A protein has these predicted regions:
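Non-catalytic macromolecular-recognition regions in eukaryotic signaling proteins
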Residues: 1-179
Length: 179
């Protein structure tokens, strides 16, 4: 996880880096990549969009078409402090915290037509029915923080993977009031 000094109410997730899979993965990661392709019915792609020697020019590194190794079906964030009257300490902030990111999932579902990357944006209590899949990037954001809710919060962030696995992270974060 990383915090953004330019947006203090933003949490970026790069902790997935150890669970990242691509067509050029090796060994066990290559096998997991193949499993993910079958799981997402992503087995018919038949064209190269960029030459391997040009891959570094896309995003400045060779991580162009890599995805995180988890599909999320539920996310929750809980604070040890009151957020507002409707969100006392210890209750879900699901209708307050937004998720965002980029995904290849819609591209695969469309049969590889249109833009390969879809933008994700929504509240964490309203994740799409088929989950958050084939993520290229992912973040959480507190878009509206009142003066009363600003300050240091000890957050518990829960991710539920589609196989039922729960990933729990604890983070101390200073939330600044929205403008």
């Amino acid at each position: 996880m990383k915090l953004n000094p330019n947006n203090p109410n933003f949490i970026g997730f790069d902790w997935f880096a150890g669970d990242e899979y691509a067509y050029d993965s090796k060994g066990e990661n290559k096998e997991r990549y193949k499993e993910l392709c079958v799981k997402h019915n992503d087995t018919n792609y038949d064209r190269r969009e960029i030459k391997p020697e040009d891959a570094l020019g896309i995003n400045g590194d060779a991580r162009y078409r890599r995805v995180f190794g988890h599909d999320f079906v539920e996310i929750d964030v809980i604070s040890d402090r009151d957020f507002d009257d409707a969100h006392p300490a210890g209750t879900s902030l699901g209708d307050v915290v937004k998720y965002g990111g980029k995904s290849y999932w819609e591209y695969v579902k469309r049969g590889y037509t249109g833009n390969p990357v879809s933008e994700l944006d929504g509240y964490i209590n309203n994740i799409p029915e088929d989950g958050l899949c084939l993520l290229k990037s992912f973040w959480l954001n507190f878009p509206e923080v009142s003066v009363e809710a600003s300050g240091t919060h000890n957050l518990q962030i829960l991710f539920v993977v589609d196989d039922g696995t729960e990933l729990v992270f604890n983070l101390t974060m200073y939330l600044e009031p929205s403008n």
